[in-house]
């Protein structure tokens, strides 16, 4: 038997999270001492994110179809409680952001102009975009990574093929296993990818631009941390009636860390799928809930929309009553659920929230420009919260139905 190379033995015996942390440290050191090399290392990050984005649409399509074809009559899918948790978590995130904005008001130094970008005209347009995403061409949905369209076609084909021959079902199941194997291989490259992402980001932008918006960033990221470590654990405890923190910390470590650096919920779908498998969750549940969560579970986006809109209000010296604040929370929740259907995501939905207070589009777009300036941290933290919560709520809903899964909550941290 061929003896394994010592370096490969070290890599295989070290957890993926530990390898990612090593990649993070090397990325920072590379940016500090060899900025030109750091910019070149950005290729590793781009390749990693590109590979994840390339495989994610096919993974979702095949897994969802295979899960529905293999679904047995009378078997629970837990989708209703998961959807409830997604909406509840997003609304509470918006409400926390409103309270934080009242307690710690932020003032913006509005910039002169913003990029040539077109925000949605209203809540109707956001919902209309989502509906049209459902009825899109399946090939176009796969090419554009339109997960609403992919889900719609995968569910439709899955239901239509429930009574197909066993050989057809076996072929689709084998195909899903094949795609999953490719995904696992891509995820093993995460340390190199994150090294490249961190090194190039620090070398090209640095953090100088962030210091002028330190207060705003503290409020934004403080809200996200409060949701991650206080509100979400309370929601999980309500579902499973056990100490929620082992599960919360596992999701943040296994999913949140990768999402923070890739800054893409779609790219993190394969990572979340792998974590769900480690937690031994039912595949027919997480195959649907994870890509759906990447589309509509947007607690981080709700915080971004609310905090930046309230910052604009405070900057202009406007008074906000309780009823308007509650309405802002509702609008932010609905808008956040449609953030994935808007080019530019949560930042371009800020003008929609600002319109509640009669703030003109010119000023609102300047607030959007501020969002782009702080995006290095804001977008990373937002994605980490959004994506890790997808797994957290899926696991909580499944564990509430099947208590035997509770023991699996700490497995990934031991096995990784």
UniProtKB/Swiss-Prot annotation:
GO biological process annotations for this chain's record? Answer: serine transport; threonine transport
Q: Which family does it belong to?
A: Belongs to the dicarboxylate/amino acid:cation symporter (DAACS) (TC 2.A.23) family.
Where, by residue number, does the polypeptide cross the bilayer? 15-35, 49-69, 82-102, 141-161, 192-212, 217-237, 288-308, 330-350, 356-376
PANTHER family noted in UniProt: PROTON/GLUTAMATE-ASPARTATE SYMPORTER, SERINE_THREONINE TRANSPORTER SSTT
Q: Does the keyword Membrane apply?
A: yes
Keyword Metal-binding, does the record have it? no
UniProt lineage: Bacteria, Pseudomonadati, Pseudomonadota, Gammaproteobacteria, Aeromonadales
Q: Which reaction does it catalyse?
A: L-serine(in) + Na(+)(in) = L-serine(out) + Na(+)(out); L-threonine(in) + Na(+)(in) = L-threonine(out) + Na(+)(out)
Q: What job does this protein perform?
A: Involved in the import of serine and threonine into the cell, with the concomitant import of sodium (symport system).
InterPro entries according to UniProt = Na-dicarboxylate_symporter, Na:dicarbo_symporter_sf, Ser_Thr_transp_SstT
In terms of HAMAP family, this protein maps to: Ser_Thr_transp_SstT
Q: Which UniProt keywords apply?
A: Amino-acid transport, Cell inner membrane, Cell membrane, Membrane, Symport, Transmembrane, Transmembrane helix, Transport
Q: What is the recorded name of this protein?
A: Serine/threonine transporter SstT
Q: What is its main location?
A: membrane
Provide any one GO MF term from the record.
Answer: neutral L-amino acid:sodium symporter activity
Please provide, in alphabetical order, the Gene Ontology terms of the cellular component aspect for this entry: plasma membrane
Q: How does it sit in the membrane?
A: Multi-pass membrane protein
Where is this protein found?
A: Cell inner membrane
């Amino acid at each position: 038997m061929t003896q394994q190379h010592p370096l490969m033995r070290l890599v295989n015996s070290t957890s993926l999270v530990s390898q990612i942390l090593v990649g993070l440290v090397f990325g920072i050191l590379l940016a500090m001492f060899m900025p030109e090399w750091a910019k070149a290392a950005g290729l590793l990050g781009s390749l990693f994110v590109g590979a994840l984005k390339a495989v994610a649409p096919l993974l979702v399509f095949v897994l969802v179809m295979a899960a529905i074809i293999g679904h047995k009559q009378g078997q629970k899918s837990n989708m209703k409680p998961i959807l409830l948790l997604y909406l509840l978590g997003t609304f509470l995130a918006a409400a926390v952001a409103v309270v934080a904005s009242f307690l710690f008001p932020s003032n913006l130094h509005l910039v002169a102009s913003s990029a040539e970008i077109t925000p949605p005209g209203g809540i109707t347009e956001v919902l209309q975009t989502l509906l049209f995403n459902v009825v899109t061409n399946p090939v176009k949905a796969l090419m554009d990574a339109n997960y609403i369209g992919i889900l719609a076609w995968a569910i439709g084909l899955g239901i239509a093929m429930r009574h197909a021959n066993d050989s057809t079902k076996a072929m689709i199941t084998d195909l899903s296993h094949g795609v999953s194997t490719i995904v696992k291989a891509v995820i093993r490259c995460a340390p190199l990818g994150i090294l490249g992402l961190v090194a190039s980001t620090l070398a090209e932008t640095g953090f100088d631009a962030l210091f002028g918006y330190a207060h705003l960033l503290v409020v934004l990221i403080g809200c996200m941390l409060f949701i991650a470590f206080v509100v979400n654990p309370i929601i999980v405890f309500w579902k499973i009636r056990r100490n929620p923190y082992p599960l919360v910390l596992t999701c943040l470590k296994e999913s949140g860390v990768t999402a923070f650096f890739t800054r893409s919920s779609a790219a993190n779908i394969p990572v979340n799928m792998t974590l769900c498998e480690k937690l031994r969750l039912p595949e027919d549940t997480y195959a649907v809930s994870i890509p759906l969560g990447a589309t509509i579970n947007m607690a981080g986006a709700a915080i971004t929309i609310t905090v930046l809109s309230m910052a604009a209000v405070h900057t202009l010296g406007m008074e906000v009553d309780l009823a308007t604040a509650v309405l802002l929370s509702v609008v932010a929740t609905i808008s956040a659920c449609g953030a994935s259907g808007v080019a530019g995501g949560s930042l371009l939905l800020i003008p929609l929230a600002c319109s509640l207070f009669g703030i003109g589009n010119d000023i609102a777009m300047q607030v959007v420009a501020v969002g782009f300036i702080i995006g290095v941290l804001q977008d990373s933290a937002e994605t980490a919260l959004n994506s890790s919560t997808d797994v957290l709520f899926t696991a909580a809903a499944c564990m509430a139905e099947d208590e035997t899964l509770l023991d699996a909550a700490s497995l990934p941290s031991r096995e990784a």
